[in-house]
């Protein structure tokens, strides 16, 4: 788990570096897109609103307990805010620098494992079939 947490930190720093390396126009477009999205006004991160699939469910299952609890809190708070048709105060909105892709390392590990499992599913034992 420590290596995956380190991977999340590397992904976060790489994401922030990419944001800094964008041209002025790219930064303005990204900021416009981000400020007009609704999920950041509810305090959610992008990976909190990814459509669920078996791969995403597996990645979420692999999250550390603290990260899972934080994710569940963000989703529950967003549901409550959405039901009451309100948003968070502007200072509590998710900032573009804080919207890191925290599920990426877990998704990559799950993809690799599924690919390896698929390769082994087609393995033919030479002793069984000479």
UniProtKB/Swiss-Prot annotation:
Major site of localization recorded for this protein: mitochondrion
Superkingdom of origin organism: Eukaryota
InterPro entries linked: QCR7, QCR7_sf
Biological process according to GO: mitochondrial electron transport, ubiquinol to cytochrome c
Swiss-Prot/TrEMBL keywords: Electron transport, Membrane, Mitochondrion, Mitochondrion inner membrane, Respiratory chain, Transport
Membrane topology: Peripheral membrane protein
SUPFAM superfamilies associated with the record: 14 kDa protein of cytochrome bc1 complex (Ubiquinol-cytochrome c reductase) (SSF81524)
Leader peptide range in chain numbering: none
Listed Gene3D superfamilies: Cytochrome b-c1 complex subunit 7 (1.10.1090.10)
Subcellular localization: Mitochondrion inner membrane
A single cellular component GO annotation: mitochondrial inner membrane
Cysteine-cysteine disulfides: none
Function: Component of the ubiquinol-cytochrome c oxidoreductase, a multisubunit transmembrane complex that is part of the mitochondrial electron transport chain which drives oxidative phosphorylation.
Subunit record text: Component of the ubiquinol-cytochrome c oxidoreductase (cytochrome b-c1 complex, complex III, CIII), a multisubunit enzyme composed of 3 respiratory subunits cytochrome b, cytochrome c1 and Rieske protein, 2 core protein subunits, and additional low-molecular weight protein subunits. The complex exists as an obligatory dimer and forms supercomplexes (SCs) in the inner mitochondrial membrane with cytochrome c oxidase (complex IV, CIV).
Family, per entry: Belongs to the UQCRB/QCR7 family.
UniProt name for this protein: Cytochrome b-c1 complex subunit 7
Species annotation: Fasciola hepatica (Liver fluke)
Lineage: Eukaryota, Metazoa, Spiralia, Lophotrochozoa, Platyhelminthes
Gene from which this protein is expressed: UBCRBP
